[in-house]
Amino acid sequence: MRKSMKQASAFEIIAARCWNVLNEGKSFTPVYVTGIAFLYYLVTGWQTSAFFLGLVYLLPLFVIYYVYDFPLHLRWFLWIPLGIAIYLFGIPDMGLLLFALGMYIFFTVFFWGTLYYHLRIGTTWWNFLRIWKLFLKNTDSTSGNVFEQLPKFLLQLVVFSAVYEAVQPVALLSEVSILSVGAFIFAFLVHRYLFNWKPVEYPAYTNSADLPAEPLAKKVVVVVIDGCRKERLYEADAPFLHRLMRQGTVYETMETIYPARTVTCFSSMFTGTYPREHGIKSNMVWDLLVKVESIFDVLKKRGKKGILFGCAHLIDAFGDYVESFTAVSHNDVVDKKIMEQAKVLYDRENPDLFIVQMIAVDQTGHSRGVLYPEYLEKIKEADALIADFYAWLTARGDMDETAFIVMADHGQGNGIGGHGHLDTGERFVPFFMHGPMIECGKKVEEFRSIVSVAPTISALLGVPLPDHARGPVLKEAFKQKEQTSYEEADHRYSRVQ
């Protein structure tokens, strides 16, 4: 007898949140610097007052580099404040800086890239032989962005070392203040004038006039292949998904949001709006649950049911609407377990909206890289599993009135499959719709955004829009009513014959 997939335990949910503190670059920097400073304090005579004063002096820099990421190309500007700090305070204790660098290499390459991935998803103990190269290419918003994190924590340790070693630390207050104010002004100007690649947001709320008078579908099923890079899907041996594309409507320039992090993207997909409104701005969610109405809320008010079958991180955004699975599973079998359990959950709950998140492609990109054969192999496996799930739905008779959507929440970059800052491979995601109410063989070339997912589900199921939805309904994918009625009748007649 097959074992059903475990739900995410309470421990896993808490552990996932703790891991995000170290995984998200914004929170990692102050935590890492504080940890290194504490170890330095332990081996240098326990100068308690100097230790705490050093941390107090660092608070403005902690805040500045939490607010301002210096994403992608902007990260090279981080070396300028570091150079100024060395000019102001002199060459610091090189032992401290070398220790910090060594611990960072240990954390990224060996703890995260090897031990963590081996224990959680079963990668080889020799993963460090590849992943160190991937970290050097990485440009995402995590702690694994070497050339973003390195100048940040070195700058802060230069300041800490100067204060800690000073005979009169208070005498350095003016220099630290000048550096902090200068760093803030510099960061503000760099981001204000050079950070210009964020997706353009829809300025107005979705027009309710775009909703059809009657529901177009009885059910909507959304399969999210987490972290599936668009061009790699097109290159992969994925015959079923490629057939769905030919027989449905494909959006060639479907754009994710910024920052392109999983919880942030899912929040935008199913509320129809942006992080500034729904409140989920990274995978590290300090204030739980989206702050606006989601498609799940809308369905519940109308006596319908929506379920998101996903990883524990998504509970932080959608709470009880999430049926969670454990992400602690060998990567070669995790998607198979997910799709087997998806059938059980769908059969038991009979939802009007069913969303399932597949994670093996994303995890392979993170642990082994997106430009290697393993990534294409995982897409091939996802294709077979989705084909099996689709056939199962068809055998139940559900596909006669179901809209079937396949998409990714974000792509993945060339390093450790990074995503967040919208580097090459992250920005545009695969997105296509299939079903009796969906146009066949159509390609939409115009820019669209994943914030259109929730409004489009509203249109398909005949329910109101979420209250802050901004994405336009993807109505160009819908067949005209007369065409749909004729083709449905022909389809049913053919089945009888």
Descriptions of predicted regions:
Residues 1-154:
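Extended, compositionally biased non-globular segments that define protein topology
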Residues 317, 343-384, 388:
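Active-site His/acidic residue clusters
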Residues 482-497:
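Phosphate/adenylate-binding glycine loop and adjacent helical scaffold
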Residues 221-224, 228, 240, 381-423, ...:
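Metal-dependent active-site segment of extracytoplasmic phospho-/sulfohydrolases and closely related
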Residues 105-109, 174-195:
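Alpha-helical membrane-embedded segments
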Residues 197-218:
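N-terminal signal-anchor transmembrane helix
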Residues 105-137, 216-217, 227-350, 453-455, ...:
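Active-site-proximal alpha/beta segments of enzymes that process anionic O-linked groups
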Residues 285, 415-416, 438-447, 463:
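Active-site rim elements
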